[in-house]
Structures are given as C-alpha cells and as structure tokens.
C-alpha cells in the first residue's frame, strides 16, 4: 500500500507540473506572432542525401511545430505549407529568401525561425546547431537548440553567428536551426521518422517558451 501511495503521489505531482508548464506556455504565447520558415521547397529542395530531401523534412517538422504552438494560443504563420518556393517563376533565390523575410514583416511577427537540415562532406558530422545573426544576441538560437537537443538527445552542436540572408535581413529576433545532418546515415534515418520529428517539434516549442520567459 505504501509503494502504491508513493507511486500515485509521483504521478499526481508529475501531472500537476506538466499541467502548470502547459498553462504557463499558453498564457505566455497567447499574444505572440511567430513565423516558422520551413527552409527550401519547390525548385529549391535543399540538401538531398540518403534518399531524403531537406525541404520535405523541414516542412514536416514545421507543421508539427505549428500545431503545437497553435494549441498555446499563439498566432503561427508558416512561410509555406506545401512543397513550393515563395518567389514568382523566374525570380532569383534571393527573391525567394526575401519573400520569407517579408512574411514576418507583413505579419508584425515577434520572432522568425527558419528550420533546416544540414549536410557535410564528413558523414560522421552530426548534431543540432543554432545560428543567429552576426553581431546580434544568440538567445533565441540558443533556446531553440537547447530545446531540440533535450527533446531528442541529439548531439549538441552549439550556437554560431551567421550571415545567412534570412537572418541578416530580419528586423526582428531571428534564428536558423539546423536540426541534424542528412549526410549522417543515423541522423538522416531519425529525421525522416515521425516519432523523432514529433520530439524535435516538442523541443522547439519548449525552446520558444523558454525564450519568451526571458523576454
């Protein structure tokens, strides 16, 4: 009876903490506008390795993040919801990237997050990496990276400054998250699995909540 009571107490305590965390996230994000950018798409497939297209992985995770964020009351906007590029036919890659930045600007977004999958000549390269605009704070990138790493037990690739178009041209807090390496067979397999994508999405949402707790 004592063991049963103890286990029941642990369960109830876990339930209370989980509920409190969920409620906190809901109240914290209720008035936030968040733009999620699934990198690449359409004529820009991104990295293609081990039979997996980066654009497909990016979109799959982004949709899962959107659904979880929507449950918190946040206004969530995806730059794309299908396998398409954003710029008009005949436009340049820069035009496509600018169109993604413009989505956030038009929406009056609070943060901009671009999701990607990495590639490297070294097939053992692995891990989640958060990129932030050079010369600006790294807190959003760090929160996202930490959330994704804790959610998946992936290799922690740290955070790094970068001059990527969508970062340097964003006027709001922005981060680009490399969710893993498609050139690494083990990570490629994980990134294509629904269960792992769900874990990534959960971690990313927790990272967003952590970011707004400090801002």
Write out the residue ranges for each language-model feature.
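Short, charged, low-complexity patches
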Residues: 58, 137, 141, 193, ...
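Catalytic-core regions of hydrolytic enzymes
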Residues: 24-140, 150
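Active-site-adjacent mobile loop/cap segments within catalytic or ligand-binding domains
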Residues: 102, 107, 114-122, 158-215
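Bacterial N-terminal signal peptides
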Residues: 8-16
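Active-site-adjacent substrate-binding region
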Residues: 137-160
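Positively charged n-region of N-terminal signal peptides that target proteins for export
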Residues: 1-8
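C-terminal segment of classical bacterial N-terminal signal peptides
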Residues: 16-22
